[in-house]
A protein has these predicted regions:
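OB-fold and OB-like single-stranded nucleic-acid-recognition modules
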Residues: 2-208
Length: 208
């Protein structure tokens, strides 16, 4: 087998693993497509998906702009530049911080205990570059329309949402972001599948 075939085989293996291996993001995206949306007033105990508007209780202040927010994802990356001047980025530091908050829909509101929360498909709210580092933050703010998946529990007869122990998940995203994902995800999956087929055919030809 020549070196080109080895490289292409590695690409195929990478694409297959990327498609098949489970992670928190894939669990969240799969569950948001299969779970029905619960109304807050009638939410049942167990894994639940809710949609609504964020209500802030005690604000956090974001690392870059000191913007009052409910929560944030903060990322610091090292910038590497190749001989052609193209940049690549590697993570130096990342963190998610979130204070307790509420979600409100047309039927009521419910508190969210944010321990272990993960933010998915979030656009950068602020980003800048300094020297060989890039700094980015994505914010959850008062009034944002969101989709959240977590475990609906109750204490003293009062329902709340927390991280689900079985799926190891308390995930949140903007409704606008998940709508875009659901619209274009089938096209992305078809593209990746087509890439795997094409590369596999090239490897087969190189082996002849």
């Amino acid at each position: 087998m020549n070196i080109s075939a080895y490289i292409l085989l590695g690409v195929v293996v990478f694409l297959i693993l990327k498609l098949l291996l489970p992670n928190a993001s894939k669990r969240f995206l799969k569950l948001q497509a299969s779970l029905p949306t619960s109304k807050i007033r009638s939410i049942a105990k167990g894994l639940a998906k809710v949609e609504g508007k964020l209500l802030m209780k005690n604000p956090l202040f974001s690392p870059i702009k000191m913007t009052p927010c409910i929560g944030y994802y903060y990322l610091i990356e090292k910038i590497d530049r190749d001989k052609e001047g193209h940049n690549s980025y590697s993570t130096i530091h990342e963190e998610t911080q979130c204070n307790p908050f509420e979600i409100e829909d047309t039927t009521g509101k419910i508190e969210v205990v944010p321990e272990g929360i993960q933010l998915f498909l979030m656009e950068n709210t602020h980003q800048y570059t300094s020297g060989e580092k890039r700094y980015s933050e994505s914010l959850l703010r008062e009034g944002d329309e969101v989709l959240l998946i977590g475990y609906a529990d109750a204490k003293g007869g009062v329902p709340f949402l927390r991280k689900d122990d079985k799926y190891k998940l308390l995930g949140i995203t903007l409704v606008s972001s998940i709508n875009l994902w659901n619209k274009y995800q089938p096209l992305l999956r078809s593209f990746l599948f087509t890439c795997v087929i094409i590369v596999s055919l090239i490897i087969f030809i190189l082996l002849q």
